[in-house]
Amino acid sequence: MAAHAMGCAAFRIFLQRCGINTQWSGFIHGAQRYYLNYNLLISNLDSYNILEIGEYVTFVDKDEEVKFFSTFSKNKKVLISYKDPLSMIRTILNANIVALNPCSKVINCSHLVENMNDLLKSYSRKYNKNNINEFDPYVLQWQMLIQESLLQYFRGCETYFLNMDDIKPQVCFSTLEKLAVYFGFNKPEISDQEFYKEKKSLATSYLLYFFPIVIRFDKCEIELNAKELTSKKDISKLLFEDVVVIDGHKICIHIDNIENLDQKILASMKKDISKVIEMLEEFIKTNKPLKEEDILNYLKHEKERRRIYREIIDFNLKTIKQHRPDIVASWKYYQE
């Protein structure tokens, strides 16, 4: 069981890498969600299947909600994830990136700087240090701080409380090894250790909106993306000695066909691609996201908002405070 702004999209990718069959149910109501879950469970009877529950506010009414949750067995193990509430609020604020002027993501190498400037100006973060007050804190209890509301339906289940700090790159692999033993799924492969150290979610990054960028050359075009495409060749190693990383994400440089690309053409392509990367890095460097300290500073000066946030947060932490006070104590910003 999870919620928005907790890193669960990346966690799902890690679980799938371990051979687990799972799918995000999204913002769908009870009957549709039941059908999706049922079909997921019977689609591969030989695999390790799990159901993911989040955003349950999408139920039409209370009766429908109760009916849906009554279909779950009470003798299954449950994993429920938690994160420092201030870090979670930071994530949801930073994930709000809005389109200003729709712009093509196709960059013509003959107008590269002009095209890139147009693209970079087409998006902006909705929230900054000066307008955090525009965010409605009650949204938290509808989509993000929902653990306490979910747990009421699983009181008899064996519950594993996961601190999402434990899927950060430096400890993610060992965490999955422990979870594999506890829940009985396949352990992550030793050869995959680097995979678990990579950032997987673009949710708070401008790259989610800028990518894929297509750079059009005279004889071909290439695509910059943070995803690996099996249908295209990644030529990043042909162009650069080191892995290309922007905003913490590994970047792939895809092309349909590498035939007829001599060293002269590759050198020219590298120059233009380097310029695109440079402009992306500079934009991200000068358009920094909010930090937890910014939110703490805002709440320090807004007494009524501070009361509302604390009331919502503390209600949602009742169970974990009872069973895993050590996790709550480890949250630096919540303690502040």
State each model region's role:
Residues 12, 17, 33, 90, ...:
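Arginine residue identity/basic-tract feature
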Residues 1-193, 197-245, 251:
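PAPS-dependent sulfotransferase catalytic domain
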Residues 20-23, 159, 313:
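Generic preference for hydrophobic/aromatic residues in regular secondary structure cores
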Residues 185-336:
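PAPS-dependent sulfotransferases, especially Golgi type II membrane carbohydrate sulfotransferases
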Residues 38-42, 60, 127, 131, ...:
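Generic alpha-helical secondary structure signal
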